[in-house]
Design a protein with these regions (language model features):
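Short, hydrophobic/amphipathic alpha-helical patches that form generic packing surfaces
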Residues: 90-91, 159-165, 295-298, 425-433
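Short clusters of hydrophobic/aromatic residues that line enzyme substrate/ligand-binding pockets
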Residues: 58-61, 177-180, 194, 288, ...
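ATP-dependent adenylate-handling active sites, centered on carboxylate activation for C-N bond formation
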Residues: 8-10, 115-118, 198-395, 413
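Cysteine-centered catalytic environments shared across enzyme families
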Residues: 1-270, 274-279, 283
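Polar, surface-exposed loop/tail segments
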Residues: 29, 33, 83, 385-391, ...
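Short amphipathic alpha-helical segments
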Residues: 15, 389, 429-430
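PAPS-dependent sulfotransferase catalytic core
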Residues: 326, 396-432
Length: 433
């Protein structure tokens, strides 16, 4: 997991700009690349997991085609490579984008080509990619792209956010900055799809989720586990133990500790400090439902205090397998997966966790597991994740199996009507003042 800026034919010096997102990397120094013939600049901070050797982890790699890779491809060895960086770049150069359907992980890849900078995002936008529409520039976060020129407030985006909590589109708070949709690439400002779910090969759900968990335990840094006491994280924890692996389970103190201790007594119970509205807006960089952002920020901060750079969670299961109450009334899966996840939940999780240099790994969001959910008829998904309960009942204590969903909340972090008005004012002052 890393951070980057890439640009072509601009007057900006990326050497100075990249330091504004230095928190996205750790354990390796910034390294830049400039191609004066093409007018290309690439800047990158690395958070290595696969190989901690600075000569291997720091990008751009001098031994590879000028490019930047952000994310993780967990099955790179299975695909015949020594690192996931080499896997992503060489797969693109030798086999093209269609070969990305073999990847298990999440990624953003930027490649310097004769036609221009190509920016590629993963199947669901787990690693968000942003670009400017008026200059050739891309980055891991939208805020840094404001430095390439004036920006105009997108009032439609803001109105949607105030109404729904997020904007279900590639728009951002600024008209000149957009997000690349999941499974798409951008070249010269033109965005095109490359991902086809029909090309994802999967087997049975239990096998594929187990494989996803095993893959996400990899790397040379310890991986922690967020154990909420709910169904999704309990399933993930159960598969970790079935694989014979040890993992540090962390529970956020929200009154659900008794359920988490039904899963394991070996638990770190942490209390979350409050997060100011101003900090939440500054970290998230765009207006959003801050009621969910604030506890996520507090959790990421606590993980770093405990010394972890990666955390495994049950994120994605609700959207995929009908975990929300609305799923019993109508089939919202498509909008939940392809609007709410890539344009609300995943950018929120990326920014809040990476601000504290923490990589989030969600086994439910592997391509194979997602395809299972997409192929499952509504009747089998309807009713509080019925398919998950039937498939993994042996891993889940009875009280958890039959309880209703509870969101991540704490007594210290709630949003009152008065606070919501403060949020609105803070958003305006921070973004458009």
């Amino acid at each position: 997991m890393c951070g980057f800026i890439a640009a072509r034919d601009v007057d900006n010096d990326l050497n100075g700009m990249i330091h504004s997102i230095s928190y996205r990397g750790y354990g390796s120094e910034y390294k830049g690349y400039e191609n004066t013939r093409h007018g290309v600049q690439l800047a990158h901070y690395s958070l290595p997991f696969v190989n901690l050797d600075p000569e291997v982890a720091v990008q751009p790699r001098q031994d590879l085609h000028p490019s930047l890779f952000v994310g993780e491809i967990f099955n790179y060895k299975e695909l015949g490579y020594e690192t996931d960086i080499e896997c992503a770049i060489n797969t693109y150069l030798k086999s093209g984008l269609q070969a990305f359907h073999n990847f298990d992980g999440f990624w953003t890849l930027v490649v310097d080509t004769r036609q221009g900078l190509v920016g590629i995002t993963d199947h669901l936008g787990i690693k968000p990619l942003y670009y400017r529409t008026d200059v050739e520039a891309m980055a891991s976060e939208p805020d840094v792209l404001k430095k390439f020129g004036p920006v105009t407030p997108d009032l439609h985006f803001l109105s949607n956010t105030m109404k729904w909590g997020y904007d279900p589109s590639p728009n951002t708070a600024w008209k000149e900055i957009k997000q690349v949709p999941p499974g798409h690439y951008v070249l010269n400002g033109i965005v095109k799809p490359y991902w086809d779910w029909k090309k994802v090969r999967n087997s049975d759900l239990r096998h594929d989720l187990t494989e996803s968990v095993q893959n996400r335990l990899g790397g040379q840094r310890d991986v922690s586990m967020l154990l909420s006491g709910g169904l999704d994280s309990t399933i993930i924890y159960g598969l970790v133990k079935q694989l014979g692996r040890d993992i540090t389970a962390i529970h956020v103190d929200n009154g659900e500790e008794d359920y988490a201790r039904l899963v394991t007594e070996d638990l770190i119970d942490v209390k979350l400090d409050d997060v100011s509205l101003e900090d939440a807006v500054e970290i998230h960089q765009t207006p959003v439902d801050l009621g969910s952002v604030r506890p996520q920020i507090a959790m990421a901060r606590k993980l770093r205090e405990l010394g972890f750079y990666a955390v495994m969670t049950g994120d994605g299961a609700d959207e995929l397998f009908g975990g929300y109450r609305r799923a019993a009334q109508y089939d919202s899966q498509y909008s939940d997966v392809f609007s709410e996840l890539p344009y609300y939940h995943l950018p929120r999780l990326d920014r809040t966790n990476m601000r504290y240099t923490v990589e989030l790994r969600a086994p439910f969001l592997s391509p194979k597991v997602i395809k299972h959910a997409l192929m499952t008829p509504y009747g089998k998904r309807n009713g509080e994740k019925k398919m998950l309960k039937e498939t993994f009942a042996d891993l889940v204590p009875e009280p958890i199996l039959n309880r209703t969903k509870h969101a991540l909340k704490t007594e210290a972090i709630r949003t009152s009507p008065e606070e919501q008005r403060m949020i609105n004012n803070t958003i305006w002052d921070s973004l458009y003042g």
